């Protein structure tokens, strides 16, 4: 099988592991920078070119598309899909997951428990927005933020109003969310492949912070998850139509709450913490689904 990995940096841990796992299972692998792909959109002879050459057909494509290049990265992935390549996460699912507002609306519609959340662009009544989510303490986020950037814990009403007013000055979309105190700065990252949680870790915020992102200096340990947490993680990934997803869960007194569904979860922290070969599980999923029938169905 011929597999393309779409990534701006082939030296990243996740890309290297996926490449190694695919090669170990006998596949040919090429890492392509999606921003260097250019496309001929033609009903008779569509194609993808890369650095001066027309690319051959790939049986499957693994998208490792960063948030900053979502628009063009998913456009390039769509072209591969149109040419019959099986995507490990479809372009439409990635775009959907990157839209935090749409994601939360879809999850809520499916009855998946979330922290109480309010979203606004430039709220005229900051006080009402705060009341809507139950008052302080609360978390204020920029909708476009990633890896804990643009996330502030406002412990008092006055602090919340000040942060919201400051974010409003950025002309940005603002997300206001109840603070789950009992989580104590921890969350659970469940790595879903297909209909299975293949690994789970607990991420704990560093001292003096409440954000558990490993990129922000948080620590990780192996997590033992409950059947309810396993079920909600799989349901969240399925709701977003993702074959592979990192589902972040908070343990609240009222039960597990989904914080986020990540369409391009990093493998380094979770593989090194659990010792589980997740990359090979992803390649095996591709082997089962990147079939000749799929290629013919999609026009490749």
Curated annotation (Swiss-Prot):
Pfam families listed in its UniProt record: RimK (PF08443), Rimk_N (PF18030)
* Residue sites binding Mg(2+) 1 per the record: 248, 260
Which of UniProt's keywords are assigned here? ATP-binding, Ligase, Magnesium, Manganese, Metal-binding, Nucleotide-binding, Protein biosynthesis
Q: Identify one Gene Ontology CC term for this UniProt entry.
A: cytoplasm
Known cofactor(s): Mg(2+); Mn(2+)
Q: What residues bind Mn(2+) 2, as annotated? A: 260, 262
Matching SUPFAM superfamilies, A to Z? Glutathione synthetase ATP-binding domain-like (SSF56059)
All copies of the ATP-grasp domain together span 104-287
- Write the Enzyme Commission number(s) for this entry: 6.3.2.-
Q: Which residues bind Mg(2+) 2?
A: 260, 262
Q: Which residues bind Mn(2+) 1?
A: 248, 260
Gene Ontology terms for molecular function: ATP binding; metal ion binding; ribosomal S6-glutamic acid ligase activity
UniProt key word Coiled coil: no
This entry's comment on the bound cofactor is: Binds 2 magnesium or manganese ions per subunit.
Biological process according to GO: protein modification process; SOS response; translation
Question: Could you say which enzyme class this protein belongs to?
Answer: ligase
Q: What Gene3D superfamilies does the entry give?
A: 3.40.50.20, ATP-grasp fold, A domain, ATP-grasp fold, B domain
> InterPro entries from the entry?
ATP-grasp, ATP-grasp_RimK-type, ATP_grasp_subdomain_1, RimK, Rimk_N, Rp_bS6_RimK/Lys_biosynth_LsyX
Where along the chain is ATP bound?
Answer: 141, 178-179, 187, 211-213
Which purpose does this protein serve, as stated in its record? Answer: An L-glutamate ligase that catalyzes the ATP-dependent post-translational addition of glutamate residues to the C-terminus of ribosomal protein bS6 (RpsF). Is also able to catalyze the synthesis of poly-alpha-glutamate in vitro, via ATP hydrolysis from unprotected glutamate as substrate. The number of glutamate residues added to either RpsF or to poly-alpha-glutamate changes with pH.
Family under the similarity heading:
Belongs to the RimK family.
Q: Could you identify this protein by its name?
A: Ribosomal protein bS6--L-glutamate ligase
> What is the organism of origin for this protein?
Escherichia coli O6:H1 (strain CFT073 / ATCC 700928 / UPEC)
